[in-house]
């Protein structure tokens, strides 16, 4: 009722200056329309039905004037209206329509050439007066309206509001004399929004919105419905005629104010100013491309939220801040799903996301026997979106290639880096093939393999050179046969006399200072070799002149007599007896 009170206040403020403006009340004949001379003409004979309009006329390219619809030979005579009925209309010169039957401008342009045409009240010319005459006083109308509104408040529910900005088109099935066929009288009037929404559309008739056919409704929605048909006013009126309805009172009050109303021109195919119409039909006509575009916009929004979430990871959220991007994304997905369902777009879920356990609509990733949202199929370690990159599975969790190799791939013992391709397993360790080489010379191992010492791998040559036993003669590694003597290993070819390099016969040798010698060189090294015969002294020996001699080999160098008495003379490292020394040197 607050809306009705506001309506009455608006009506009072609007009609406060009505006393300064004329109010025209006229009586409506059953087959008449206003002309430029402000008189009524009545059709003499019902004309034949005109042919259907051409396709050009329907498309709004050809404007048929109203005169073309008049049959030839029709004559109209002035007739007294049988009963008073107020008619209010307004038109402009520029009003035009594509079809005379569904146009407001055609009817108004045919009415006359004035800028604004108002119907003047005709005096009662009939012999018999009307049973009831409606009062033209504005006060009586207002009091009647107040009484009706009180009754309406007691009986019916209060309406939701009065849409003063909307325009309804009221069609009357009374035939118009000037058209020559059954037409519709078009009256512009405000209407209640609830009543308009509850009224059903009229099939096959003019569209309730500005006389456009319903099949060609440019707004794609359901416009305001037609108001109730006005009954034909004959000579007598009943109780219902005496008590006008709320709609008729509103029409009278609205049209009593001579405020110019601009004509509404509707061309079939375009509309000069689109009206706001809310309808479920408009929503159900959305195309599949529109739904796809909404999904693309949603994916772009998801990417923006992802970047926002990554940028805000390091910073703490202020107290009382906004909700998390995850909840906003869930809200967006839920609202999109409900909106698509309301619009009639079937969104069949392509599966349930393995991460968020929610249905998937749009792009889907299939991996590891599950379906995922693209933004939820991320690396378990770094939480980066995997997308179309390669990934590895570990314990049912996806990992990107970098993190998987970093976490689970074997490490090279040499460089400690992850092994991505080929691997060499040796010494209970793993190696890159290019990092498994000799620890001494750096050469790669050939078919002969490698040798291990102290956890390191060596080639054959370096291993024996470094760790194999060395020969006592040549100091080289002994690889095959060897001779063990003097606490040393010897190559067989290296175990010989260290002086004459003669192999030992029957394996017997003499040792001096840790080296093997033959008998001769052994005694020579030791000084036990007879200086006279150059043979080893195995028994008694005489030591003279820092030399050793067999007793029988120590003789005079001139007479060769044995010097057994123990006296001799030495001259030039040679022993002489005393008589020979005197003879030779004295």
Curated annotation (Swiss-Prot):
Locate the N-acetylmethionine modifications and list their residues.
1
Short sequence motif named LD motif 3, residue ranges:
245-257
Task: Report any one BP term from Gene Ontology.
Answer: substrate adhesion-dependent cell spreading
Q: Does the keyword Metal-binding belong to this entry? A: yes
Q: Which PROSITE patterns match?
A: LIM_DOMAIN_1 (PS00478), LIM_DOMAIN_2 (PS50023)
Q: Motif LD motif 2 at which residues?
A: 144-156
Primary location group: cytoplasm
Which top-rank group of organisms is this from? Answer: Eukaryota
Query: For the modification Phosphotyrosine, which residues carry it?
Result: 31, 88, 118, 210
Q: Where is this region: Disordered?
A: 13-138, 220-241, 266-290, 309-329
Any idea what this protein is called?
Paxillin
């Amino acid at each position: 009722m607050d809306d009705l009170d506001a309506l009455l206040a608006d009506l009072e403020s609007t009609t406060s200056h009505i006393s300064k403006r004329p109010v025209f009340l006229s009586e409506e004949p059953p087959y008449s329309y206003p002309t430029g001379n402000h008189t009524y003409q009545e059709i003499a004979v019902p004309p034949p039905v005109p042919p259907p309009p051409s396709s050009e006329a329907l498309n709004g390219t050809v404007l048929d004037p109203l005169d073309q619809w008049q049959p030839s030979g029709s004559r109209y005579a002035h007739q007294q209206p049988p009963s008073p009925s107020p008619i209010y209309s307004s038109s402009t010169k520029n009003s035009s329509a594509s079809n005379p039957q569904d146009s407001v401008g055609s009817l108004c342009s045919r009415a006359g050439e004035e800028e604004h045409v108002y119907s003047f009240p005709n005096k009662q010319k009939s012999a018999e007066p009307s049973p009831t005459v409606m009062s033209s006083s504005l006060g009586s109308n207002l009091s009647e309206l107040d009484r009706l509104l009180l009754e309406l408040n007691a009986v019916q529910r209060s309406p939701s509001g009065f849409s003063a900005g909307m325009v309804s088109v009221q069609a009357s099935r009374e035939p118009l004399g000037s058209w020559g066929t059954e037409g519709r009288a078009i009256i512009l009037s405000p209407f209640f929004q609830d009543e308009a929404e509850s009224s059903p559309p009229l099939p096959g008739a003019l569209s309730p919105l500005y006389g456009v056919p319903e099949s060609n409704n440019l707004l794609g929605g359901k416009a305001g419905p037609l108001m109730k048909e006005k009954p034909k006013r004959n000579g007598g009126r009943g109780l219902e005629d005496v008590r006008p309805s709320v709609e008729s009172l509103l029409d009278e009050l609205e049209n009593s104010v001579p405020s110019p109303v601009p004509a509404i021109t509707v061309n079939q195919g375009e509309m000069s100013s689109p009206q706001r119409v809310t309808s479920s039909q408009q929503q159900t006509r959305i195309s599949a491309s529109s739904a796809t575009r909404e999904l693309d916009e949603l994916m772009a929004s998801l990417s923006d939220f992802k970047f926002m979430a990554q940028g805000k990871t390091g910073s703490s959220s202020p107290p009382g801040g906004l909700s998390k991007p995850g909840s906003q994304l869930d809200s967006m997905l839920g609202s999109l799903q409900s909106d698509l369902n309301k619009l009639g777009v079937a969104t069949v879920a392509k599966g349930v996301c393995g991460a968020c356990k929610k249905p998937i609509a749009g792009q889907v990733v299939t991996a590891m026997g599950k379906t995922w949202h693209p933004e939820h199929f991320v690396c378990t370690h770094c939480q980066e979106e995997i997308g179309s990159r390669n990934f590895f599975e570990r314990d049912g969790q996806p990992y990107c290639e970098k993190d998987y190799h970093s976490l689970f791939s074997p490490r090279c013992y040499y460089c400690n880096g992850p092994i991505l391709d080929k691997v060499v397993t040796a010494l209970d360790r793993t190696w890159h093939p290019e990092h498994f080489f000799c620890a001494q010379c750096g050469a790669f191992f050939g078919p002969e393999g490698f040798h291990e010492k102290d956890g390191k791998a060596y080639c054959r040559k370096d291993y024996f050179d470094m760790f194999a036993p060395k020969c006592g003669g040549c100091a080289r590694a002994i690889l095959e046969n060897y001779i063990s003597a003097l606490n040393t290993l010897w190559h067989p070819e290296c175990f010989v006399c260290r002086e004459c390099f003669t192999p030992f016969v029957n394996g017997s040798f003499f040792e001096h200072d840790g080296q093997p010698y033959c008998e001769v060189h052994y005694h020579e090294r030791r000084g036990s070799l007879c200086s006279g015969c150059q043979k080893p002294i195995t028994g008694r020996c005489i030591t003279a002149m820092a030399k050793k001699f067999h007793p029988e080999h120590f003789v005079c160098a001139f007479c060769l007599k044995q010097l057994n008495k123990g006296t001799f003379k030495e001259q030039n490292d040679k022993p002489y007896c005393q008589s020979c020394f005197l003879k030779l040197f004295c």
